Amino acid sequence: MNWLDYKKKFEPSKKWIISNQSSSGAIFWDEKGKCDPWDHCECLIALAIYEEWEHFWRGVNWFFTNLNEDGLIYAEFQNEKPSKLHYESHHAPYIIMPLIQASLIDEEQDYNKILTNEQLLKLENIFEVLNDFKDEDGYFYWAKDSNGYSDNSLITASMSIFLSLMAKDKSFPKFNIEMWHEKFNRDGVDRSRFSMDFYYPYLAGIKNNNKEFLELLDNYYVKGLGVKCVAEEPWVTIAESSECVISALIHDNENIAKQIFNDIQQFQNKDGIFPTGYQYDMEIFWPEENSTWTNAAVIIAAHALSFYDLGSNNSSVNVFLELRNFFNSN
């Protein structure tokens, strides 16, 4: 399916995102008023793809307004007030992804032309402050609060940081990969059961073994339904499935990417909106919500699929495929 067909098909998802944006620009999780800054940025990528520039820049301005002087943003907002008073290291840097996506779609939307001087300085500060989260081996602590930095690094959060850094600077992050198992999940919690910990290193171009990717995918992929959030749970989630589609495309697993994406189309409801997840043993949608960021992930995956089909000369209109081109050239 080409992008124009997908664009029409997922118009309700885009409208759902816009309907949950406040006048200040915050994009809520759903109609209950919670806002996660990373999810907010994911929604901005989708709005850029749809060229909804008024809503896009309103969301960008909200983000910069809520950055503190240290280039950090609170981990969660409820009804536009901070509700979690710590900072997660991958949140603020992710704003570069929608900014670059906008520039790729329309050069007139180049953030270097549109952001104010103050905002551009804040953007640089985000990445300077990020160094304070980094340990001597190049691994990032996942959070900071009033007591200091968390003595733990998380795979998914770190890979999101790597994505942001590579999108901004077009250079691979330097870290001691031999210390991977020692550095990640130092709290003793095994997070390998989560599909995000499996596919995010591939999404970020840190891992590139296709055989290993497909073998690990078997632990999470339920044919005909999608990708599970947690290996042992009978629960497929639409955002994880969509992100896994992009991860597969980045490493040229086009057939499995299309298969997974086709699987999840059955979950688009009568209003054209996707739920967060589906518990297939109980045959219920769970949780009972239609999250904006889930619908954004579907849009991003559809866009990536459309332009992957057209080859590398056209793939630079999608920020993730643009990164794929960078991975392949290095």
Where do the PLM segments sit?
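Extended ligand-binding clefts on enzyme/binding-domain cores
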Residues: 4, 12, 89-90, 113, ...
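Acidic/His metal-coordination segments adjacent to aromatic residues that form catalytic metal sites
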Residues: 70-85, 141-151, 184, 223-224, ...
